[in-house]
């Protein structure tokens, strides 16, 4: 069950950088100065997804009940705004290195904001990129994230919605230390130049190279930013219709696609088709994750999570921000069907 926090009087940290399409701010708890991230639902022209913050909270609760390492989200009130809140994943001596930094560090021609690069965002591109930073063993965590997304129907696992917690510490270098570092960098760049010249790529203005030049230490972060799921974009009328129309319900699930693509053409696949393809190469990992989900899945527990998720929401906010029983029923039905389809992959 999610807790409720009134963070109106907490200390806002406007100098912190936040990303994404939703209204966000960073605050610190005055009791212990711990850092939290607060965000509301998406609200812009043509897109008023009021239940979106609930999707974040529900997916977090369900994910953790099924054995996934998902960041905990709770309900929060910030002035006149209602949204979800999560505690910072990293300490002051750590930082979150987002996937986008790893992908662009691996391939300098990759431009995630350029539509022509969208098709490059594939499972194997991610695999190659993390391997280049000596993080190849973490591919299991990437697969876990993809399987988690299939359960909640998340369609927005973009490059900034996954990453690694890495050591971070500001250090002032002496002149001697700085000269030593720059000398090593100079030697490394010379090696790269020699490699390119030897392979006749240095004089090609469009040439680029992918090389393992760094070793990164760190761990895969908890799964975060998973609010684009659970039919959060559907109106109350559409929710009621989906509950009574099996064709519409099945079509909605079938249309759900992963943001992480597949193949040389970078095609977007249905969540379950993507997992089937990954399973061809990583059957032991995929089957292990799915079997663990099946062993932890308790239909009554999932229903209890969903139907009590807004129990701590104050009564004066319930009419405007509470979830209807119809929406809760649809969310439960979606989770139940998606887990069944996931189970069928390994049968």
What is each PLM-predicted segment?
Residues 89-146, 171-191, 204, 312:
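ATP-dependent phospho-/nucleotidyl transfer catalytic cores
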Residues 169-347:
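C-terminal catalytic region of ATP-dependent kinase domains
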Residues 156, 161:
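Conserved catalytic-loop position in the HRD/HxD motif
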Residues 1-110:
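Conserved ATP-binding subdomain of kinase catalytic cores across diverse folds
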